[in-house]
């Protein structure tokens, strides 16, 4: 129950007692209730969406508490990426939670031409960036927190827990002396991780009824459906105008 609802409920109990007691304060209590209803805005959740050209979703539903978070300074970032055609149109998504399971932020973004790996990387990267913004807004010290980035992409998790260290040691080159694919994204991922400090990447099996992972997957695919439907409609309209 919101704070506003609790205040009104308490006042109405008092009002009922005043009415039954036939006290002159009944009318006064009515005016107090009216004032509360008009003056207090409905309570809003302490969630934040990234300030970017992205499609944000407000209906998160109920999620369980993040599986790795053990203290108030532990936070979880779930991310996902999708691509149709690979390469082709794609989308990334991210969702941030605290230890209690409260959704702190969520976002999804569409790309006209990309790959699945780039979208998986982008989901994790943008999720970390959003957490940094959230921490700054609510005065949370990055020195105190531990972040768990949870993804169903082995590419992301193995890259950040194993490959990046070797690439950096070789001047961002692979063992065969070639530049890693999506190198600019890997570099940015590494920089953002270092700016936070304590970040651990965890793998979760995709399409295995994991609520947060399934939600991120749904955000990606719903955004893709919407964007591609809009594109097809626009193309159809242009073709019709030529006849």
Which residue stretches match the model-derived regions?
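Non-catalytic propeptide/linker segments at domain boundaries
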Residues: 46-60
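Threonine-centered tandem repeat motifs in low-complexity domains
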Residues: 233-237
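Short, low-complexity, charged amphipathic interaction modules
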Residues: 1-46
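RNase H catalytic domain
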Residues: 2-4, 82-86, 125-215, 239
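RNase H-like nuclease fold core
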Residues: 57-118, 129-134, 217-218, 222-232, ...
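Phosphate-ester processing/binding pockets and catalytic centers
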Residues: 37, 103-106, 112, 136-146
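Short, conserved alpha-helix that lines the donor NDP-sugar binding/gating region
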Residues: 120, 124
